[in-house]
Amino acid sequence: MDVLYSLSKTLKDARDKIVEGTLYSNVSDLIQQFNQMIITMNGNEFQTGGIGNLPIRNWNFDFGLLGTTLLNLDANYVETARNTIDYFVDFVDNVCMDEMVRESQRNGIAPQSDSLRKLSGLKFKRINFDNSSEYIENWNLQNRRQRTGFTFHKPNIFPYSASFTLNRSQPAHDNLMGTMWLNAGSEIQVAGFDYSCAINAPANTQQFEHIVQLRRVLTTATITLLPDAERFSFPRVINSADGATTWYFNPVILRPNNVEVEFLLNGQIINTYQARFGTIIARNFDTIRLSFQLMRPPNMTPAVAALFPNAQPFEHHATVGLTLRIESAVCESVLADASETMLANVTSVRQEYAIPVGPVFPPGMNWTDLITNYSPSREDNLQRVFTVASIRSMLVK
């Protein structure tokens, strides 16, 4: 894997810097590395593809070295270099695709394609000169079963979940109380509602709670907490739990009271915040517990009192909500996030070449399914294919 990365890094630098008019002295070190790559690869044969509709391709390496010059690089020099670069780039691209479409239930962190296994041989280590990629660094750690750490921005840690629970219900669905939520990606939005605006509740207050368990532990997380849930701030028609009917939700938004968010690890509270909004942090956690209250306003203008009558019908429904958004965090496991295209890169290649469903990944690389059942086998394979996707993205956009 590290050899594949160094190949890609050398080719990217060569493609960017070996251009007509450049002083040879400015790229002499790069050309030496480029020639070392050619010397190492010459005389070797590889085969890629042969799975799904990914075509079989044979690769043979027999290229001349780039020479030295005291002057600027001319058009002939650059054209010779370009022909070599283009062939190598095509080769790396196909090795990456061949690796991204393969999976294994055992030792999925190790190379799975014949071409990448061959590149892992000792003689190709002479190519290796740069392991500065976070993915490569973590792949090497995971390969040795040592602690890894990926930094993510808006990590897709929450499987998609959108539903509701009713703490008070009746067949007519005209005086409901409960919670509804939407968890997806890096965000939780949860709302508590009471059609009667807590008129018969103790101290005219309703208590709500929402608990979310993560599939992986996050550390050093920067989080935004807001006293609102905008996705539940407009009227909607909702299917009943049994699917037999629908009910109407017409929210009027109040500010939540006694808001508390707890971050827990293995059942132990690590961080707690009370009535604190904006940016907060959590050291390490695998569970988030949100609790908040809906309090009937003790003093209301006539206009507000008209919204919340003392008896049915309740045409407007008192609602309070919270939004929790993970802006950045560190995780030992690889995840999809907002700043990278690895999941899309892997999925698009697998779809384009009609790769059959294997023993590890769900059909279509469905992320909700994948993260919900994030087994060690999936973790190993996902880290490998994401690492390869990061290498491919250096050369192919």
From Swiss-Prot:
Cellular compartment(s): Virion
Keyword annotations from UniProtKB, A to Z: Calcium, Capsid protein, Intermediate capsid protein, Metal-binding, Ubl conjugation, Virion, Zinc
Record-level Gene Ontology MF annotations: host cell surface receptor binding; metal ion binding; structural molecule activity
Gene3D superfamilies membership: 2.60.120.170, Viral capsid alpha domain
SUPFAM superfamilies: A virus capsid protein alpha-helical domain, Viral protein domain
One GO process term, biological-process aspect: fusion of virus membrane with host plasma membrane
Annotated residues for binding of Ca(2+): N266, D286
Residues binding Zn(2+), per UniProt: H153
Cellular component aspect of the GO annotation: viral envelope; viral intermediate capsid
Pfam families to which the protein is assigned, alphabetical: Rota_Capsid_VP6 (PF00980)
UniProt keyword Transcription regulation present: no
Sequence segments annotated as region (Interaction with the inner capsid protein VP2): 62-73
UniProt PTM: The N-terminus is blocked. Sumoylated with SUMO1 and SUMO2. Sumoylation of viral proteins seems to have a positive role on viral replication.
Main location: virion
InterPro entries: Capsid_hemagglutn, Rotavirus_A/C_VP6, Virus_capsid_a-hlx_vir
Family membership noted in the UniProt record: Belongs to the rotavirus VP6 family.
Miscellaneous comment in the UniProt entry for this protein: The VP6 trimer contains a zinc ion located at the center of the molecule. The zinc ion is not essential for either trimerization or transcription activity of the DLP. Zinc-depleted VP6 has an increased sensitivity to proteases.
Its biological purpose: Intermediate capsid protein that self assembles to form an icosahedral capsid with a T=13 symmetry, which consists of 230 trimers of VP6, with channels at each of its five-fold vertices. This capsid constitutes the middle concentric layer of the viral mature particle. The innermost VP2 capsid and the intermediate VP6 capsid remain intact following cell entry to protect the dsRNA from degradation and to prevent unfavorable antiviral responses in the host cell during all the replication cycle of the virus.
Xref: HAMAP family: Rota_VP6, Rota_VP6_A
Subunit-level organization: Homotrimer. Interacts with the inner capsid protein VP2. Interacts with the outer capsid glycoprotein VP7. Interacts with the outer capsid protein VP5*.
The name this protein goes by in its record: Intermediate capsid protein VP6
